[in-house]
Regions:
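N-terminal, positively charged/glycine-rich alpha-helical extensions of SAM-dependent methyltransferases
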Residues: 1-32, 182
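Conserved alpha-helix/loop element of class I SAM-dependent methyltransferases that forms part
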Residues: 32-35, 42-61, 77
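A short acidic, Gly/Pro-enriched loop at the edge of an enzyme's catalytic core
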Residues: 121-132
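A short glycine-rich, Lys/Arg-flanked "PGG" loop and its adjoining helix->strand segment in the class I
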Residues: 146-161
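C-terminal alpha-helical "lid/dimerization" subdomain adjacent to the S-adenosyl-L-methionine
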Residues: 165-223, 229
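Core SAM-dependent methyltransferase catalytic element
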Residues: 223-226, 232-250
Length: 250
């Protein structure tokens, strides 16, 4: 496995068609990523992930694909809730993967979770391969979002589910103005201050640019997914989208 700080992944850890360096921004903030997540979310991010994994309604001995797995928080949550599952995590950031692999080893899940350098837009897996597919706080950063959604629809079993967690600027609700102020002002400033990196300004901009929940659910439909639930969380700062492959999917 690649050690933290290596320039390139071992060939055995790279999926075909993955462009090296596409996770460069996250390479720069990887060392403080988990800490910043806890601080900026006030610790609520753990609950968001628990809800996403529960929404998969996985069968025994499930096979799960976690896209943009990062430091493996979702992969490990799957195994906390379903110890008999097998999880494959893909991410384009070497540094995030290295931290995730250390966490997997510490949790004693080396045989149940495998983390690979890979691209959500081009999955080298057969149709209907996974009981569940997840992506947490990652679809916003995928260049070709429609292609990634179509790939999720393709590799999910007909009876399986897809769970997508994403950050966005709150648009509705009594506390929406306060939540928007937090996202626009405090998130980038606190993130940059604590990390010493400007990437958390990108976080605010990308949240503002992400489609409203209804619009994103429609994008899922166009990509071959049938939305089952759209659930705003924490005053709409996060939304959980749950879907299954559409009836017309191959």
């Amino acid at each position: 496995m690649s050690a933290l700080g290596e320039d390139r992944p071992h060939p055995d850890e790279v999926l075909p068609g993955t462009a090296f360096g596409s996770g460069a921004m996250f390479d720069r903030i990887a060392a403080r990523y988990d800490t910043l997540n806890r601080i900026l979310s006030l610790g609520v991010d753990r609950r968001w992930r628990r809800l996403a994994v529960r929404a998969l309604a996985l069968p025994p001995a499930a096979r799960v694909l976690d896209l943009v797995t990062g430091t493996a928080d979702v992969a490990l949550e799957v195994l906390r809730q379903h110890p008999d599952a097998r999880v494959l995590g893909l991410d384009p950031s070497l540094q995030m993967l290295a931290i995730g692999r250390r966490k997997v080893r510490r949790a004693g899940h080396e045989r149940s979770a495998e983390l690979l350098f890979g691209d959500a837009q081009d999955l080298p897996y057969a149709d209907r391969s996974f009981d569940g597919v997840t992506i947490a706080f990652g679809i916003r950063n995928v260049p070709d979002r429609a292609r990634a959604l179509a790939e999720m629809a393709r590799v999910t079993k007909r009876e399986g589910r897809v769970a997508i967690l994403e950050l966005m600027e709150p648009r509705e609700g009594f506390l929406a103005p306060l939540a928007r102020s937090f996202v626009r002002s405090l998130v980038p400033r606190v993130g940059a201050l604590l990390s010493g990196a400007p990437e958390y300004r990108y976080l605010q901009r990308s949240m503002a640019a992400f489609p409203a929940p209804d619009a994103f659910a429609e994008a899922m439909r166009r990509a071959g997914l049938e939305p089952l639930e759209t659930r705003p969380l924490t005053q709409g700062v996060v939304c959980l989208f749950v879907a299954r492959p559409g009836r017309g999917a191959a």
